[in-house]
């Protein structure tokens, strides 16, 4: 749910805030455009205004309850990621995780998110858009039949022992098996390509609407283990495999730094 004008998803209905009585649900009663108000006031003060968006989560659960499109719309619920847990492959909706991520591999998910970004770009005085959580949920994501088929298409062969030939259930980042599973490096490469290609398309679509708006991302600086969320935020000139044993020879091709302002 959002605080800007769009027909793609619903407006925020409540937010949590710490008050004198503790963490409290604050119902939204205002009908004015929150983002436009920030733009207007920011410009009066000579400030630049950037809009941040939680990219791939479709809902969130807190002590105040569950909110988000995946809790209201069964079609969108079906887009959520499936995790390679130690107890089998499970929907993120069925495990104890607060943020309910979509599967970034899905074409319908990508179009859904980009449509929202296009609406953000229509704010003519907005200085920039920053994507947070523009990534996979984590190392366990995504092991749906949809993603398996896309991966098999990418490598040109069937994965016979799934998911063990990719990542054995329960594998932790930084505690990789030796030797690495048959398709492990290509899997990391595939995921990095998924996020890279999303960013390239999203930037192009945003710039087509507003060429002046800046496009950027918020990422973690721990590059050596950031493969767990499928993100290569480096320059493609940095040959990842020369430094890290988990990277394929092509992993560096999907560094998306040149596509950020």
Model feature map: region roles:
Residues 1-2, 123-127, 260-261:
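Catalytic domains of carbohydrate-active enzymes, especially glycoside hydrolases
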Residues 2-17, 57-95, 133-174, 228-242:
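Aromatic- and acidic-residue-enriched segments that line the glycan-binding/catalytic groove
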Residues 2-57, 186, 190-209:
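Aromatic-lined substrate-binding rim segments of carbohydrate-active enzymes
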Residues 28, 32-40, 50-124, 173-185:
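Active-site-adjacent "subsite" loops/lids of carbohydrate-active enzymes
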Residues 49-51, 129-132, 215-217, 261:
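Hydrophobic faces of well-ordered beta-strands that scaffold small-molecule active sites
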Residues 58-66, 139, 199, 208-261:
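Substrate-binding cleft/loops of secretory-pathway carbohydrate-active enzymes
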Residues 115, 123, 128-131, 137, ...:
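Active-site neighborhood of glycoside hydrolase catalytic domains
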Residues 118, 204, 254:
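Active-site phosphate/pyrophosphate- and oxyanion-stabilizing loops and adjacent acidic/basic residues
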């Amino acid at each position: 749910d959002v605080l800007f004008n769009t027909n793609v998803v619903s407006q925020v209905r409540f937010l949590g805030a710490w008050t004198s009585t503790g963490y409290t649900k604050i119902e939204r009663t205002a009908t004015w455009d929150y983002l436009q108000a920030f733009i207007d006031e920011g410009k009066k003060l000579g400030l630049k205004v950037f809009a941040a968006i939680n990219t791939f989560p479709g809902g969130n659960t807190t002590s105040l309850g569950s909110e988000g499109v995946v809790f209201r719309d069964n079609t969108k619920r079906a887009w959520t990621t499936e995790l390679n847990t130690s107890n089998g492959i499970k929907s993120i909706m069925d495990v104890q995780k607060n943020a309910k991520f979509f599967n970034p591999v899905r074409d319908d998910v990508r179009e859904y998110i980009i449509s929202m970004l296009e609406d953000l770009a229509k704010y003519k005085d907005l200085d920039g858009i920053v994507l947070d959580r523009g990534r996979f949920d984590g190392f366990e994501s995504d092991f749906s039949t949809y993603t398996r088929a896309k991966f098999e298409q990418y490598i040109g062969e069937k994965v016979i022992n799934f998911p063990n030939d990719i990542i054995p259930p329960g594998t932790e980042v930084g505690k990789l098996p030796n030797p690495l599973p048959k398709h492990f490096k290509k899997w990391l490469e595939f995921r990095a390509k998924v996020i890279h290609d999303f960013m390239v398309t999203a930037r192009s679509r945003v710039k087509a609407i507003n060429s002046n708006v800046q496009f950027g991302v918020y990422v973690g600086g721990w590059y050596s283990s950031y493969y767990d969320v499928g993100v290569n935020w480096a320059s493609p000139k940095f040959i990842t495999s020369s430094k890290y044993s988990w990277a394929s020879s092509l992993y560096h091709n999907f560094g998306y730094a040149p596509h950020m302002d």
